[in-house]
Regions:
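Sec-dependent signal peptide recognition
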Residues: 2-10
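Hydrophobic h-region of N-terminal signal peptides that target proteins for export
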Residues: 9-19
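N-terminal cap/lid segment of alpha/beta-hydrolase-fold proteins
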Residues: 19-53
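Short beta-strand element of the alpha/beta-hydrolase
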Residues: 55-64
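Alpha/beta-hydrolase fold active-site loops
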Residues: 57, 83, 125
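Short beta-to-alpha linker loops that shape the active-site pocket of alpha/beta-hydrolase fold enzymes
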Residues: 65, 89-96
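Short amphipathic alpha-helix adjacent to the substrate-entry channel of hydrolases
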Residues: 71-88
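Primarily recognizes the serine-hydrolase "nucleophile elbow" in alpha/beta-hydrolase
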Residues: 110-155
Length: 155
């Protein structure tokens, strides 16, 4: 049992050491023309990056919550050496319809394509991922090309 505890401690310390090398840009508006207060409040993202790393792969992370709850996060497990991680917040039901939430996800991914280079991210190596409702948004944006086409992206 003692070995398990020691192993967990070492893993935790390693993750903390890697995470300590990261800088964060928080509360970034990804809808330039937000329009209303709710959209401006919700359509935000956080970026974790390593300032001295260039051409890093990028993970765009969508939180779960059944499209009715949850908030943006950057999972510590994704903070591996040389990766940029973007945690996305989006509007929630019942304030907006489901397809508006999908559009928020597409707008966030388009913003990443346009801006992630400033944070050392490689636009040819962007991956989208999510948990639960976030996984649904990943599917909707990733499998339906017209979602990103609205933002001039062919991905």
């Amino acid at each position: 049992m003692n070995k398990i505890g020691l192993t967990l401690l070492l893993v935790w310390l390693a993750v903390r050491a890697i995470a300590a090398d990261y800088s964060y840009e928080r509360n970034v508006l990804y809808r330039g023309n937000a329009g209303d207060e709710y959209t401006s409040k919700m359509c935000r993202l956080d970026i974790a990056y390593q300032p001295d790393v260039q051409n890093a792969p990028v993970v765009v992370w969508f939180h779960g919550g059944g499209l009715t709850g949850g908030s943006r996060e950057i999972p510590s497990g994704l903070l591996t050496d040389g990766m940029v991680v973007v945690g996305v917040e989006y509007r929630l039901s019942p304030h907006v319809e489901t397809m508006e939430i999908v559009d928020d996800a597409a707008a966030a991914v388009a913003w990443v394509f346009d801006n992630i280079g400033k944070y050392g991210g490689d636009t040819s190596s962007i991956y989208i991922a999510g948990h639960s409702a976030g996984g649904y948004l990943v599917d909707m944006v990733g499998l339906d090309k017209k979602q990103l086409a609205r933002y001039g992206k062919d991905a």
